[in-house]
Amino acid sequence: MPARRKARKRALDVLFEADLRGRPPVEVLAGYVERIEKPRPEHLGYAVGLVEGVAARLDRVDELIASYAEGWTLDRMPTVDRNLARIAVYELLYVDEIDDAVAISEAVELARQMSTDDSPRFLNGLLGRIAEYATR
């Protein structure tokens, strides 16, 4: 698995846990980082950056997801999909070195591995609309 995909997976793990437990993502992240054995994986820095970035801009990210998710509310989305969308939207808007197509395809691939059969198509459409229409 490529390093950045591993980072996205780790970020998803943290955001998923924070979402389920109703705790701040940065608090869950601190506990997660403490538990990682040394030497720490090279992709950890990118994962930490994703979680911290999503947490810092969560209101804006969630607002965009809610605006472009046709027929879905954030609360109705599967937890995995909601948090994959958060990571991808953060990358689309705030991580300049990641191409939009890469951010979208990575979210779709993780959804294919970890979520429902309909999730890849849903995320592809949602993220495609956000990439095309959202103000950056």
Swiss-Prot record:
Gene Ontology cellular component list: cytosol
Q: What keywords would UniProt list here?
A: RNA-binding, Transcription, Transcription antitermination, Transcription regulation
**Single GO biological process annotation from the record:** transcription antitermination
The record, for InterPro entries, names: NusB-like_sf, NusB_fam, NusB_RsmB_TIM44
Asked if Transcription is a keyword of the record, the answer is yes
Determine if Lyase is one of this entry's keywords.
no
Q: Which Gene Ontology molecular function entries are recorded, alphabetically?
A: RNA binding
- Name the job this protein performs: Involved in transcription antitermination. Required for transcription of ribosomal RNA (rRNA) genes. Binds specifically to the boxA antiterminator sequence of the ribosomal RNA (rrn) operons.
Similarity comment text for this entry: Belongs to the NusB family.
What is the protein's name according to its record? Answer: Transcription antitermination protein NusB
Say which species the protein is native to: Salinispora tropica (strain ATCC BAA-916 / DSM 44818 / JCM 13857 / NBRC 105044 / CNB-440)
Ranked from the top, the taxonomy reads:
Bacteria, Bacillati, Actinomycetota, Actinomycetes, Micromonosporales
Designated gene of the protein = nusB
